[in-house]
């Protein structure tokens, strides 16, 4: 048998750290203002593309949920905080700094949701939470099914919010759209704005707004 040898030259290198920022907005709760619900996505992307699905879609979901709540005059019981995280792709610095600040300020975070799986048709949500909390969330399925949510399971929340769970044991939730086309685009040159469907993107925001409303209304 012949031996195949492959030679590869790469020119990647580590550069010195620079300053980045999370972008944070919130709607203050009217009944339990000290209880915080976080909704977010991350700002950065790989340099070979526009980051339209990863994670431009999550950023749009976050902003659209906030816009819709403000547009209808929704007054939450609990504080809803909208976070666009910095540096998810190669360091998780934004998520880590957010959790560290929450711990330092002794904030009470009851739930955190991230959208970081693309802007495709909604399919469900996944959790990092106790079996009891996942079971409680599943009782909401009939309310969300008309809008596309078909499943809720315990396969984990998002990466940016994971430090909240590690440091403060906050229950996590990840938005799960249809995954069939995600790896045609993920970290690839094809992850561009033209490959985002506006209707699918907005359906994701609808489902995220729905579960945030339920957590705000009933707690978690």
Regions found by a protein language model. Give the residues of each.
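Metal-dependent peptidase/peptidase-like ectodomains
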Residues: 32, 47, 85-185
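Phosphate-handling active-site elements
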Residues: 67-80, 107
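Soluble non-cytosolic domains of exported or imported proteins
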Residues: 15, 52-60, 74, 89-93, ...
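Extracytoplasmic/secreted envelope proteins and their assembly/folding machinery
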Residues: 59, 63-66, 77, 92-99, ...
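Soluble metallo-hydrolase cores and metallopeptidase-like ectodomains found primarily
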Residues: 1-52, 64-71
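Surface-exposed patches in mature extracellular/periplasmic domains of secreted proteins
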Residues: 2-8, 149-156, 220
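His/Asp/Glu-rich mid-to-C-terminal helical/loop segments that flank catalytic regions of hydrolases
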Residues: 67, 71, 182-220
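Structural recognition of the beta-strand scaffold that forms the well-ordered cores
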Residues: 7, 23-26, 36-40, 81-84, ...
């Amino acid at each position: 048998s012949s031996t195949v040898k492959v030679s590869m030259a790469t020119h990647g290198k580590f550069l010195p750290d620079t300053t980045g920022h999370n972008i944070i907005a919130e709607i203050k709760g009217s009944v339990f203002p000290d209880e915080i619900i976080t909704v977010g996505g991350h700002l950065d992307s790989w340099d070979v593309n526009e980051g339209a699905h990863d994670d431009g879609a999550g950023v749009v979901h976050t902003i659209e949920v906030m816009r819709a709540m403000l547009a209808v005059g929704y007054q939450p019981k609990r504080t809803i905080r909208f976070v666009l995280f910095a540096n998810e792709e190669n360091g998780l610095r934004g998520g880590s700094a957010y959790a560290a600040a929450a711990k330092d300020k002794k904030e009470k975070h009851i739930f955190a949701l991230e959208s970081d799986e693309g802007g495709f048709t909604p399919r469900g949500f996944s959790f990092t939470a106790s079996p009891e909390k996942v079971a409680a969330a599943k009782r909401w399925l009939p309310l969300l099914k008309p809008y596309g949510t078909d499943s809720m399971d315990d396969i984990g929340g998002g990466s940016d919010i994971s430090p909240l769970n590690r440091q403060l044991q906050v229950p996590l939730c990840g938005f799960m759209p249809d995954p069939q086309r995600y790896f045609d685009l993920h970290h690839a040159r094809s992850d561009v704005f033209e490959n985002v469907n506006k209707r699918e993107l907005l359906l994701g925001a609808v489902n995220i707004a729905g579960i945030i409303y339920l957590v705000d209304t009933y707690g978690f």
